[in-house]
């Protein structure tokens, strides 16, 4: 695979969706959880989305239950939680695994492009990959990086 656009993932209805639909946009790919101490980052993510979506920015939300089971529940329950507590409107996909033998191919590729605090492994919920309009990883941000701290990098790519 040569770019993010070469991948397909499952949407929340378990239908295969090509990421080529996001060609030409600046993307932030995030593994998320609804029961984590970092869950309030959803607010900052939504603020970035509101500010830059019209300029070609999208956030791709991938719930992940690999870190202490902090993303329990069905897709519907996760959507309800995010809508009720954080009014999120960015695209959310089916739950995936980001580490180990069952890691989604998208995340295998992302981790191969940029290492993080633990090398290639995703360290926790809310690790972020910023993707340029060319479908390539521009930067990787740790779970602890507040969404507002990456705003300048987003602006550069827009």
Question: Which ranges hold each PLM region?
Answer:
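Chalcogenol-based redox active-site neighborhoods
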Residues: 1-158
